[in-house]
């Protein structure tokens, strides 16, 4: 996929950079693999904001993605590659030999007409899904499970992947894009290849309105608020906040470690950079 630049005939086109999607499917998604998705506006079940700066956005249909790849030893052919508004990666519609359809995350270099399979005996080929114990060291992977049978959780975003760097004592050691080395059970599944749409990191929305279409509202700085709203608020004239950066609730921000899950720390061999 290439990037598209535009002639600056309007101010918002001057900086706009988009991913070229001309090779993707131009029709509607498969109806049996979609469902409605309601907007939350960043609110929880009590109506309180738990995710700031969310709201609005274009109406979407949710595409049901197969992260588990549980259809074992049944070959499938790639029918088409599609855009998915719910994620940065592209998705692939596959048709199994028994006639069943499914959506999977599309890896880079997967093309229409390619065959994919989920099997212990599968070839080490783009789009094939295998247990980690059956994959040679040095292979690039995506959609990696953390618990057996739970479905892929690691490396699902556009352009991401992990590297299998070792196996020992029932665990595989994988290297994440963050620099973290992590242990994953050898019976967990992973899919060969890197996720599609690696140019996602190079796009430029060009105007605030495009962020609104995506469901993002304006991000107001704390120093622009009143003292009642934020610890950085208030002051005569423009101020710098007068203290080290904090959240609206007074906790240090911009770099302070907040990870609490010590239960799984034993699976982290080396922390991220």
From Swiss-Prot:
<dbReference type="GO" id="GO:0019843">
    <property type="term" value="F:rRNA binding"/>
</dbReference>
<protein>
    <recommendedName>
        <fullName>Large ribosomal subunit protein uL2</fullName>
    </recommendedName>
</protein>
<dbReference type="GO" id="GO:0006412">
    <property type="term" value="P:translation"/>
</dbReference>
<dbReference type="InterPro" id="IPR014726">
    <property type="entry name" value="Ribosomal_uL2_dom3"/>
</dbReference>
<keyword id="KW-0689">Ribosomal protein</keyword>
<dbReference type="InterPro" id="IPR012340">
    <property type="entry name" value="NA-bd_OB-fold"/>
</dbReference>
<dbReference type="InterPro" id="IPR014722">
    <property type="entry name" value="Rib_uL2_dom2"/>
</dbReference>
<dbReference type="InterPro" id="IPR022669">
    <property type="entry name" value="Ribosomal_uL2_C"/>
</dbReference>
<dbReference type="GO" id="GO:0003735">
    <property type="term" value="F:structural constituent of ribosome"/>
</dbReference>
<dbReference type="InterPro" id="IPR022671">
    <property type="entry name" value="Ribosomal_uL2_CS"/>
</dbReference>
<dbReference type="InterPro" id="IPR002171">
    <property type="entry name" value="Ribosomal_uL2"/>
</dbReference>
<dbReference type="GO" id="GO:0016740">
    <property type="term" value="F:transferase activity"/>
</dbReference>
<comment type="similarity">
    <text>Belongs to the universal ribosomal protein uL2 family.</text>
</comment>
<dbReference type="InterPro" id="IPR022666">
    <property type="entry name" value="Ribosomal_uL2_RNA-bd_dom"/>
</dbReference>
<feature type="compositionally biased region" description="Basic residues">
    <location>
        <begin position="254"/>
        <end position="273"/>
    </location>
</feature>
<dbReference type="InterPro" id="IPR005880">
    <property type="entry name" value="Ribosomal_uL2_bac/org-type"/>
</dbReference>
<keyword id="KW-0687">Ribonucleoprotein</keyword>
<keyword id="KW-0694">RNA-binding</keyword>
<comment type="function">
    <text>One of the primary rRNA binding proteins. Required for association of the 30S and 50S subunits to form the 70S ribosome, for tRNA binding and peptide bond formation. It has been suggested to have peptidyltransferase activity; this is somewhat controversial. Makes several contacts with the 16S rRNA in the 70S ribosome.</text>
</comment>
<feature type="region of interest" description="Disordered">
    <location>
        <begin position="228"/>
        <end position="273"/>
    </location>
</feature>
<comment type="subunit">
    <text>Part of the 50S ribosomal subunit. Forms a bridge to the 30S subunit in the 70S ribosome.</text>
</comment>
<dbReference type="Pfam" id="PF00181">
    <property type="entry name" value="Ribosomal_L2"/>
</dbReference>
<dbReference type="Pfam" id="PF03947">
    <property type="entry name" value="Ribosomal_L2_C"/>
</dbReference>
<dbReference type="InterPro" id="IPR008991">
    <property type="entry name" value="Translation_prot_SH3-like_sf"/>
</dbReference>
<keyword id="KW-0699">rRNA-binding</keyword>
<dbReference type="GO" id="GO:0015934">
    <property type="term" value="C:large ribosomal subunit"/>
</dbReference>
């Amino acid at each position: 996929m290439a990037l598209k630049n535009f002639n600056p005939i309007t101010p918002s086109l001057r900086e706009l950079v988009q991913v070229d999607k001309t090779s993707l499917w131009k029709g509607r998604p498969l109806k049996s693999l979609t469902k409605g998705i309601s907007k939350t506006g960043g609110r929880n079940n009590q109506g309180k904001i738990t995710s700031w700066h969310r709201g609005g956005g274009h109406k979407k249909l949710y595409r049901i993605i197969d992260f588990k790849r549980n259809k074992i030893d049944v070959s499938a052919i790639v029918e088409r590659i599609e855009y998915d508004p719910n994620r940065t990666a592209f998705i692939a519609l596959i048709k199994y030999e028994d006639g069943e359809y499914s959506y999977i995350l599309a890896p880079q270099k997967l093309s229409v007409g390619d065959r994919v399979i989920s099997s212990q005996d599968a070839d080490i080929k783009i789009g094939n899904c295998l247990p980690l114990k059956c994959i040679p060291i040095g292979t690039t992977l995506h959609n990696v499970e953390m618990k057996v049978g739970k479905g892929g959780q690691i490396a699902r975003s556009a352009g991401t992947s992990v590297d299998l760097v070792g196996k020992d004592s029932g665990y595989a050691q994988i290297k994440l894009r963050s620099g973290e080395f992590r242990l994953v059970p050898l019976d967990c599944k992973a899919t060969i290849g890197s996720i599609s749409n690696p140019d996602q990191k190079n796009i430029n929305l060009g105007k605030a309105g495009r962020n609104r279409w995506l469901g993002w509202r304006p991000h107001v700085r704390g120093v622009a608020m009143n003292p009642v709203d934020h610890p950085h608020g208030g002051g005569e004239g423009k101020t710098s906040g007068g203290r080290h950066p904090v959240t609206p609730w007074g906790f240090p921000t911009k770099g302070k470690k907040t990870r609490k899950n010590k239960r799984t720390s034993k699976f982290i061999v080396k922390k991220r950079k």
